[in-house]
Amino acid sequence: MDINEIKDIKTKELVQKYNFRFSKSLGQNFLIDDSVPRDIVNGADVCEDDLVIEIGPGVGTLTVQLLKRAKRVVAIELDSSLIPILTAELGDNPKFQLIHNDALKVDFNEIIGDEKSVKLVANLPYYVTTPIIVNLLKGGYNFKSLTIMIQKEVAERMNAEPNCKDYGALSILVQYYCNTKIVRKVPPSCFIPRPKVDSIVIRLERLEEPSVKVKNEKLFFEIVRHAFNMRRKTLWNATKNVKLPKELMEKAYEEAGIDPKRRGETLSLAEFGALSDAIDKYMNN
């Protein structure tokens, strides 16, 4: 199909045409500003060699722009009422594949197969943003990048530095696996229905190797989780659930050069890595 034959989708027109009813439980907000999908595609640097996986295509407003640039687009949609709309509007395009499923239950490796250049693009429902990001980053999938539209506050948490109120486990997770770049801000007026918060399009560029090298990744994230689950407590109290005798835990803190009276929110990524490696050493002695 000639890309010139791919017509832009007018969200409001399709919503009226199909008498679509928005689902509050699914957190649906569809784009109506034509500049946003184009900026997302440009920000994701989509090109003709790319397989693009889109989560939450809605009525296909962003999907159409992806189809103009990508080799292939696989869209994952949970809402059964959107399946016939997407099929009717985009089903004839040989570059388009639609999967009716929950993105949290999808095996992305089955979709990716042998593809070498895979990018994920998504307008994520706010209520599942963090679980989806955790799954995508820790799942070991071969994504070059994730370009996602999310709540402004979540984007700020991803980019947060130590000693900041937004700094937490999500900051560590994202910065461990990715470099981040803000593509653009998106005000509520760009959607129907209008959300009550501002949104941001952010690109997560997957690093070839994690930003910090750790011996035991599972333990590393366990320590991070303990530190931020009890963020007002000292590291010493927060890591009491780690199964290591007191005297060995003291040695681990000393070896890592970290005062156990500090709070988790003061530690850099590198310091969490050093503490994790020191604890791992004594756990395996």
Swiss-Prot record:
Question: Which PROSITE patterns does this entry report, sorted A to Z?
Answer: RRNA_A_DIMETH, SAM_RNA_A_N6_MT
Q: Where does S-adenosyl-L-methionine bind?
A: N29, L31, G56, E77, D102, N123
Output the Gene3D superfamilies linked to this UniProt entry.
Answer: Ribosomal RNA adenine dimethylase-like, domain 2, Vaccinia Virus protein VP39
Its keywords, alphabetically, are: Cytoplasm, Methyltransferase, RNA-binding, rRNA processing, S-adenosyl-L-methionine, Transferase
Using the UniProt record, name the top-level EC class of this enzyme in a single word.
transferase
Database matches in InterPro entries: KsgA/Erm, rRNA_Ade_diMease-like_C, rRNA_Ade_Mease_Trfase_CS, rRNA_Ade_methylase_Trfase_N, rRNA_adenine_dimethylase, SAM-dependent_MTases_sf
What disulfide bonds does the UniProt entry report for this chain?
none
Catalytic activity, per the record? adenosine(1518)/adenosine(1519) in 16S rRNA + 4 S-adenosyl-L-methionine = N(6)-dimethyladenosine(1518)/N(6)-dimethyladenosine(1519) in 16S rRNA + 4 S-adenosyl-L-homocysteine + 4 H(+)
Q: What is the protein's major site of localization?
A: cytoplasm
The highest taxon in the source lineage is: Bacteria
Q: Which terms does the record give in the GO molecular function aspect?
A: 16S rRNA (adenine(1518)-N(6)/adenine(1519)-N(6))-dimethyltransferase activity; RNA binding
Q: Which GO CC annotations does the UniProt entry carry?
A: cytosol
Q: Where in the cell is it found?
A: Cytoplasm
Which EC numbers does the record give? 2.1.1.182
Q: Which family does it belong to?
A: Belongs to the class I-like SAM-binding methyltransferase superfamily. rRNA adenine N(6)-methyltransferase family. RsmA subfamily.
What PANTHER family has UniProt attached to this entry?
A: DIMETHYLADENOSINE TRANSFERASE (PTHR11727), DIMETHYLADENOSINE TRANSFERASE-RELATED (PTHR11727:SF7)
> What does this chain do?
Specifically dimethylates two adjacent adenosines (A1518 and A1519) in the loop of a conserved hairpin near the 3'-end of 16S rRNA in the 30S particle. May play a critical role in biogenesis of 30S subunits.
Q: Entry's NCBIfam families?
A: ksgA
HAMAP family documented for this protein: 16SrRNA_methyltr_A (MF_00607)
* Protein name per UniProt: Ribosomal RNA small subunit methyltransferase A
> What phylogenetic lineage does the species belong to?
Bacteria, Bacillati, Bacillota, Clostridia, Eubacteriales
